[in-house]
């Protein structure tokens, strides 16, 4: 989610040296535009370049930094209704010698959106594989990272394309049968009983609903100005019809437990990261994965909700870096035996 937009004030007030009066005027009148400027600035500051690739008539939008080298490239898959720039807060703390790729998931941001496309988890896995082939990422094995919906896709991808993957990081992934029901899943059951699909907490259409969504997704309670909330909603509203279509594809029987059905096929070294106070997808899902993926590492973050990437970016980056380093050390030791 877009919790790191709060940093926008520091960026606009100091780093960008925008005159205070102009900033205040823009903030009051065009909050959505400022949010886009915020992401543009951080992409430039972190060296993430926006690029496009094609597979047939299908276009993918992604950002990347660096080039493939001795270390495995890292492909990062975002969650439901987010975009490639949600990873910027983590990229900030990742080593600059890593080759990073952050792609807009099918139908999101700059990647092709079509009402005829298959947005089920298997459909998205197929598209991500097409993206990987379109940029030649699987010429060598790579590290795959996914959060929430992206974690579901990443896990199923690793199960279906094991020769592409060197290692895997799943951050509070969807697609499991959770032993403990979360607040959000209880909310969904209530909607199913009432037949009301217009009040999905992850698809806000007002500033108030946006605030409710952020409270659901984050353990940290930020006091966010109404202008920022309105800006976040204004950016999302034109896409809400698509988000609703996508959401229905994800909760359909075809996708609801996709990761659960494929997790025993995952053979790559796997790391699980989960916020202990996750109200969207309960942390008990980590136990489910640990019981099926041999030797996987589980990291539970205290005082952290579903938006792990935004709430704990430095910690997330460190855990991933340490995991990759440990795998590299193991590989080096094997070579010297």
From Swiss-Prot:
Domain of life: Eukaryota
Enzyme type, top EC level: hydrolase
Catalysed conversion reaction: Hydrolyzes glycerol monoesters of long-chain fatty acids; 1-octanoylglycerol + H2O = octanoate + glycerol + H(+); 1-decanoylglycerol + H2O = decanoate + glycerol + H(+); 1-dodecanoylglycerol + H2O = dodecanoate + glycerol + H(+)
Membrane-related topology note: Single-pass type II membrane protein
Database matches in Gene3D superfamilies: alpha/beta hydrolase
Keywords of this entry: Endosome, Hydrolase, Lipid metabolism, Lysosome, Membrane, Mitochondrion, Signal-anchor, Transmembrane, Transmembrane helix
Residues in the signal sequence: none
EC number(s) per entry: 3.1.1.23
UniProt key word RNA-binding: no
Function: Lipase that preferentially hydrolysis medium-chain saturated monoacylglycerols including 2-arachidonoylglycerol. Through 2-arachidonoylglycerol degradation may regulate endocannabinoid signaling pathways. Also has a lysophosphatidyl lipase activity with a preference for lysophosphatidylglycerol among other lysophospholipids. Also able to degrade bis(monoacylglycero)phosphate (BMP) and constitutes the major enzyme for BMP catabolism.
Protein name from the UniProt record: Monoacylglycerol lipase abhd6-A
Classification of source organism: Eukaryota, Metazoa, Chordata, Craniata, Vertebrata
């Amino acid at each position: 989610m877009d919790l790191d937009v709060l940093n926008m004030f520091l960026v606009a007030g100091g780093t960008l040296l925008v005159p205070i009066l102009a900033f205040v005027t823009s903030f009051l009148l065009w909050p959505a535009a400022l949010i886009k400027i915020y992401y543009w600035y951080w992409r430039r500051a972190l060296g993430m370049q926006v690029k496009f690739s094609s597979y047939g008539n299908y276009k993918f939008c992604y950002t990347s930094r660096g080039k493939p080298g001795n270390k495995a490239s890292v492909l990062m898959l975002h969650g439901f209704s987010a975009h490639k720039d949600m990873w910027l807060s983590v990229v900030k703390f990742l080593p600059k010698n890593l080759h990073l790729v952050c792609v807009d998931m099918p139908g999101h941001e700059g990647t092709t959106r079509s009402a005829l496309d298959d947005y089920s988890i298997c459909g998205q896995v197929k598209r991500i594989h097409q993206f990987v082939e379109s940029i030649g990422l699987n010429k060598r094995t790579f590290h795959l990272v996914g959060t929430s919906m992206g974690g579901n896709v990443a896990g199923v991808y690793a199960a279906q394309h094991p020769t592409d993957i060197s290692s895997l990081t799943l951050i509070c992934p969807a697609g499991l049968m959770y032993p403990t029901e979360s607040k959000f899943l209880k909310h969904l059951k209530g909607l199913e009983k009432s037949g009301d699909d217009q009040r999905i907490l992850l698809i806000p259409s007002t500033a108030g609903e946006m605030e409710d969504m952020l409270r659901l997704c984050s353990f940290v309670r930020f006091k966010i100005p109404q202008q920022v909330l309105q800006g976040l909603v204004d950016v999302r509203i034109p896409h809400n019809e698509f988000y609703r279509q996508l959401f229905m594809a994800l909760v359909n029987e075809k996708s609801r437990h996709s990761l659960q059905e494929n997790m025993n096929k995952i053979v790559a070294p796997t790391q699980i990261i989960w916020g202990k106070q996750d109200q969207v997808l309960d942390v008990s899902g980590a136990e489910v994965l640990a019981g099926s993926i041999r030797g996987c590492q589980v990291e539970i973050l205290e005082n952290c909700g579903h938006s792990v990437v935004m709430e704990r970016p430095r910690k997330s980056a460190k855990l991933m870096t340490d995991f990759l380093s440990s795998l590299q050390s193991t590989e080096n030791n094997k070579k010297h035996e």
